[in-house]
């Protein structure tokens, strides 16, 4: 399941707003989880047949709300995504900037975390570009509490939230990343995304 949250986070980095039409339920979150298991099982069997699995926006956001809380990094809460199509994604999360500042702030006057404190809404939008088992993010816009922020600050947040035991240095928005579970590409359509293995 860990790669599923990473995949959602990747989509979310292109757009860190749930549509008002989405009704989120635990059942939809569970449906998302079952699909993740099926995608991983397909990868584990070493099957050579191609397979496409679609995840709806409601399933994705239900999973984030009901199933993924313990999988999210400390300091990141209430994530949600809107899938626009054309591989465009937007989304938001509440970020505890005090946690970010305590762990990685330089404390300098040019460090944005020196001025921003508390839990603030962060929004972003962009495109997810994938193919041949790799992906990258094309960031279009990001904001903290409605104020546009520079890409360097987005990179600082991404770097902080992507640090793991396997990736202790973290990542940036500009990094090319390998897609998990033998996924070759991801297509984002209005209200859903499809992974192709």
Please name every model-derived segment.
Residues 2-6, 10-197:
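Extracellular/lumenal and peripheral-membrane lipid-interaction modules
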């Amino acid at each position: 399941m860990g790669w599923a949250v990473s995949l959602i986070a990747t989509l979310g980095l292109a757009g860190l707003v749930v549509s008002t039409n989405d009704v989120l339920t635990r059942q939809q979150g569970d449906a998302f989880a079952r699909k993740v298991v099926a995608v991983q099982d397909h990868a584990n069997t070493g099957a050579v047949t191609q397979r496409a699995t679609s995840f709806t926006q409601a399933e994705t956001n239900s999973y984030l709300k009901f199933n993924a809380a313990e999988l999210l990094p400390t300091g990141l809460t209430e994530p949600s995504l809107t899938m626009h199509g054309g591989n465009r994604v937007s989304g938001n999360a509440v970020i505890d900037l005090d946690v970010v500042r305590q762990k990685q702030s330089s404390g300098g006057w040019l460090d944005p975390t020196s001025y921003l404190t508390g839990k603030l809404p962060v929004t972003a939008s962009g495109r997810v570009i994938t193919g041949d088992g790799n992906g990258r993010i094309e960031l279009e816009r990001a904001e903290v509490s409605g104020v546009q922020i520079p890409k360097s600050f987005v990179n600082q947040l991404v770097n902080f939230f992507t640090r793991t035991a396997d990736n202790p240095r973290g990542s940036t928005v500009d990094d090319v990343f390998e897609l998990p579970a033998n996924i070759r590409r991801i297509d984002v359509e209005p209200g859903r995304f499809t992974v192709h293995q």
